[in-house]
Amino acid sequence: MTVVGNPRSWSCRWLPILILLLGTGHGPGVEGVTHYKAGDPVILYVNKVGPYHNPQETYHYYQLPVCCPEKIRHKSLSLGEVLDGDRMAESLYEIRFRENVEKRILCHMQLSSAQVEQLRQAIEELYYFEFVVDDLPIRGFVGYMEESGFLPHSHKIGLWTHLDFHLEFRGDRIIFANVSVRDVKPHSLDGLRPDEFLGLTHAYSVRWSETSVERRSDRRHGDDGGFFPRTLEIHWLSIINSMVLVFLLVGFVAVILMRVLRNDLARYNLDEETTSAGSGDDFDQGDNGWKIIHTDVFRFPPYRGLLCAVLGVGAQFLALGTGIIVMALLGMFNVHRHGAINSAAILLYALTCCISGYVSSHFYRQIGGERWVWNIILTTSLFSVPFFLTWSVVNSVHWANGSTQALPATTILLLLTVWLLVGFPLTVIGGIFGKNNASPFDAPCRTKNIAREIPPQPWYKSTVIHMTVGGFLPFSAISVELYYIFATVWGREQYTLYGILFFVFAILLSVGACISIALTYFQLSGEDYRWWWRSVLSVGSTGLFIFLYSVFYYARRSNMSGAVQTVEFFGYSLLTGYVFFLMLGTISFFSSLKFIRYIYVNLKMD
């Protein structure tokens, strides 16, 4: 066979227009762009195939011994489609708009024993194919397997050789597409001797029906006996439970802490007025708690460059996550495919690099940092280096196994070009603005030259305990929704409840801010002024809980297996936990900083 129109050629039309990373076909707001007349040809593309329980382990459909044209012509793909592992190619199926086909022969094949064994292995691994009609995915199983555990034991494997396509239209647009094998018996692949050939006849039928649904987004893709139940009530119960947690934490911070602080401030200021003749050291001897460390609480932390880089990249991902959710709320993504989300994430990451540079450089200059160039390099490397290392391992495994998830060299070159020409320069530009607009750190209290000795702390005020409490509470607020997100990313479910996702994201940030303030207050009350890094680690540890949940999900909630899927799952789960660490660590730090400024600015000090 001859391959025409290699899918890698798509990059040639992308290089001159890097900013249009969302591509064509799956771009924002694109839905039903093709209009047909009765009898017009409708192209069906074959795409990819792979184990049902391993969605990221995909191979080209024509790698199986199936009907294919003499010359394989590939469809020009967008960036999002390539990132999603798509490799669309023209097929032998002839479909015309609104024309039914009872039964049409696709091709006749003579399969060798090796080819039959390849099909048997694919069916035993529950291979699941994907075709594409007018940007609508059509999915189904390659064959049928029946296992009997009773005596006599039987193990039957059959290949579906007749596919029944059902398409729904509205006016001149295709709204829905599906494939089934109803009333069709599979062709048995059992009992073939090594020197025998198996003759097969592949056929198909097409049924058209008109629908009252006007938009594809209104037609649930699972209405044809979908794989997943509708659990909207569970989502809302999760929201309610999380909101209760938020109200409890906000009430704890706003009522209990503020009342304690009000009493402490009143007593502190009263004692200062009655002992104005004494020295500050004498006063310190008669006081305790967070008030006594007012000369040390704003002492700059070690590794300030790394801290500022964490805050900068965390702020960038906060903007990136918010942008993705808002775009989803506006209906800018195709709910049936993830390619546009991948493209949007790359575009937003490149554009929001200016945020990381600005925040990092601005705060670094405020707290007295002098190595500005090193700070920018650290900021640009804090996420990109771990991501590149993880991607290199994952992509190498895909490439070694011939998976379509392995990115072509042209795609890699394009993404590197985007980072070098857009991401890195914007980080530097943001850093320059941040450095030039930074004013000296405005501390309400003067810092002594000699650091105060920190008394021994009880076990429940240790960093590990704070990380456990500060990570578990935000995680518990999103744990239910996290299952559905994992089932979408690492499974076959379709997630469309972006409004609920927005609420959950807001709840996550609110819980993180509240618990950070509470933990910081408890730390300061023990005369421990090393809150800078502690505030980042305490709530940032939510990322660790998310990674631990991913391990639980892999072991107990999924049927994923094999080196390809396992390496990708744990590699990107580690990155996901790292991103949440950066985001929530940033929220936690600035919440604690705002809280500390508030309580110390109200102290009367000379």
Curated annotation (Swiss-Prot):
User: For this UniProt entry, which segments traverse the membrane?
Assistant: 237-257, 310-330, 339-359, 373-393, 412-432, 469-489, 499-519, 535-555, 570-590
Glycosylation-annotated residues? 178, 401, 559
Lineage, opening ranks: Eukaryota, Metazoa, Chordata, Craniata, Vertebrata
Compartment(s): Lysosome membrane; Cytoplasmic vesicle, Autophagosome membrane
What domain of life does the native source organism fall in? Eukaryota
Has UniProt tagged this entry with the keyword Iron?
no
Q: Where is the signal peptide?
A: 1-27
InterPro entries recorded: EMP70
Entry annotated with the keyword Lyase: no
* The protein's name in its UniProt record: Transmembrane 9 superfamily member 1
Gene Ontology CC, one term: lysosomal membrane
Q: Which GO terms describe its biological process?
A: autophagy; protein localization to membrane
Report the sequence similarity comment from the record.
Belongs to the nonaspanin (TM9SF) (TC 9.A.2) family.
One Pfam match, given by its short name, reads EMP70
**Keywords attached to this entry:** Autophagy, Cytoplasmic vesicle, Glycoprotein, Lysosome, Membrane, Signal, Transmembrane, Transmembrane helix
* Function according to Swiss-Prot or TrEMBL: Plays an essential role in autophagy.
Annotated membrane topology is: Multi-pass membrane protein
